[in-house]
Regions:
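Noncatalytic carbohydrate-binding groove/subsite architecture in carbohydrate-active enzymes
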Residues: 194-205, 363-445
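Acidic-and-aromatic substrate-binding clefts and catalytic sites of carbohydrate-active enzymes
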Residues: 139-141, 217-221, 279-280, 306-312, ...
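Structured segments of extracytoplasmic/periplasmic soluble domains
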Residues: 27, 214, 292-296, 320-324, ...
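Active-site-proximal beta-strand/loop segments in catalytic clefts of secreted hydrolases
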Residues: 26-29, 240-243, 303-307, 349-353, ...
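Acidic (Asp/Glu)-rich catalytic clusters
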Residues: 229-231, 290-294, 322, 334-342, ...
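Substrate-binding cleft of extracellular glycoside hydrolase catalytic domains
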Residues: 187, 298, 319-330, 344
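Active-site groove signature of glycoside hydrolases
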Residues: 199-200, 241-244, 327-363, 416-421
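Extracellular and organelle-lumenal recognition/adhesion modules and their flexible linkers in secreted
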Residues: 1-282, 299-301, 309, 315, ...
Length: 445
């Protein structure tokens, strides 16, 4: 039996569909960045997190039978040289094991000592720019090699002769003893289980501050294939850097070299623990994000760190994005090669404030008072910004207090709803019920 269905279109009633109807949230969480959008191939390349019992950083293995390994630390607010990575400014936020380096001490002459990392995916038609940052106390040769899984086949290698950096007796300032060495590794093979090793044989100490390796076709440190997929699906509004990660993000760290930017530990470690041990290596900065938006045709939508960044710091971010090249932060943007303002209009006043997983003001009135101060400081830089408030919705108290109080300054609201589905993949009927629940979700949001 056939059934006929008719669709009637009322041409007298029209409405405008926003070009931003289809948007995405690009958050530094789970595998979204590392092994996702980022082209960086080295995992835990800045040695963050608690080391293993043998002193070797997570995702790395030690080389040598009788070698001492340890993680060297930089204490919060310290300028001491214990680690290479650091934050641009101390904003009061403190996280564990962000600023560290890998120490290697070889007590036996001619013993091969160092570290290695497995499971690198190599392509024969690609070259790989490689860099390592080291500090030594005496001359030694640092050998870098790309090999197969058991080390019997060397695909590419190079040796960096390293001399210690010595301070002059009359030096007035502290000397940076860290040195960065670069090369291009061209393995010429396809291997999904390759190994990178960094070794030396002298009876000496080697400190490694950061390691970097990316394919030569990356787009602003991002994977070209992933960028093309984002372009293909037609994202028109892209929110960044979160999400929950907005509460960890320090936008001013972009003024440091990418290798020197300290990793950022997530307050909600459980989200990224299985993927990056709870740390983000800060591979993507504001300039990279804007370049991505322009490449895929999306409007940029930035989220401030309302809990830890002051109104002045958030206003400075607006000036970096939108200020003329003659302004303080616009000048910094121009010096980085971007003379014209980015004209970022959409800004989120924090993320999901009111939920327990976000730090800062978690009451409707407290949140509204906090972000209103931030918003007014930002509007002094760019008066026509479009602010979006956040909160735990549906929640009538937040509607009555927060939304109404912020309405004159933030007319848009971001509703983050979490829906539960009865997962049942044990039978065709269960799968059909699960599917139907999923497709009905928009009706309730």
């Amino acid at each position: 039996q056939q059934h006929s269905h008719y669709l009637y279109i009322d041409l007298k009633t029209t409405s405008t569909v926003s070009p931003h109807l289809f948007g995405h949230n690009l958050e530094h969480t789970r595998a979204s960045i590392m092994d996702g959008l980022s082209a960086q191939m080295i995992r835990n390349r800045k040695f963050a997190g608690a080391a293993a019992r043998n002193g070797v950083a997570l995702d790395w293995e030690g080389i040598g039978e009788c070698v001492y390994f340890a993680n060297e630390h930089r204490l919060p607010g310290s300028n001491a040289n214990e680690a290479y990575v650091c934050h641009y400014a101390h904003n009061g936020m403190w996280r564990r094991n962000e600023c560290q380096s890998q120490m290697i001490q070889n007590p036996i002459p001619n013993q091969v000592s160092g570290i290695r990392q497995k499971e690198l995916f190599l392509q024969k038609d690609r070259s790989y720019p490689f860099a390592v940052v080291v500090k030594v106390q005496q001359p030694l040769d640092v050998r870098v090699a790309l090999t197969n899984a058991d080390g019997t086949q060397i695909y590419a290698e190079t040796v960096f002769p390293v001399q210690p950096v010595l301070a002059k007796e009359d030096a007035q300032e502290e000397v940076d003893e860290w040195q960065r060495f670069e090369t291009i590794l061209t393995p010429g093979v396809d291997d999904a289980h390759a190994v990178i090793s960094i070794t030396y044989t002298e009876q000496a100490q080697l400190l490694i501050g950061a390691v970097s390796m990316m394919p030569d076709n990356h787009f602003h440190t991002m994977r070209r294939d992933t960028v093309e997929k984002l372009k293909e699906i037609g994202v028109r509004l892209l929110r960044w850097p979160g999400g929950n990660f907005a509460g960890e993000y320090r936008w001013q760290d972009m003024f440091l070299h990418p290798d020197r930017r300290a990793p950022m530990e997530g307050y909600m470690e459980n989200e990224t623990q299985p993927f990056t041990h709870g740390y983000d290596m800060h591979e993507i900065d504001t300039d990279d994000f804007i370049a991505l938006c322009r490449e895929i045709g999306a409007e940029p939508f930035l989220t401030i760190n309302a809990a830890w960044d002051s109104p002045e710091v958030c206003a400075a971010w607006v000036e970096y994005c939108n200020g003329p090249a003659e302004s303080k932060y616009g000048r910094l943007r121009a010096q980085r090669g971007h003379q014209e303002p980015y004209n970022v209009k959409w800004w989120s006043l924090g993320n999901e404030m009111g939920y327990g997983h976000m730090e800062g003001a978690n009451t409707p009135d407290g949140y509204a008072s906090l972000v209103e101060t931030h918003a007014r400081a930002m509007l002094k830089v760019t008066p026509d910004l479009k602010f979006v408030s956040s909160g735990p919705y549906p929640n009538q108290e937040w509607v009555d207090v927060s939304i109404k109080k912020l309405a004159p300054i933030a007319p848009y609201v971001s509703l983050h709803t979490y829906n539960s589905v009865h997962w049942d993949f044990t039978s065709p009927e269960g799968m059909e019920r699960c599917y139907n629940e999923m497709i009905r979700m928009p009706i309730h949001n």
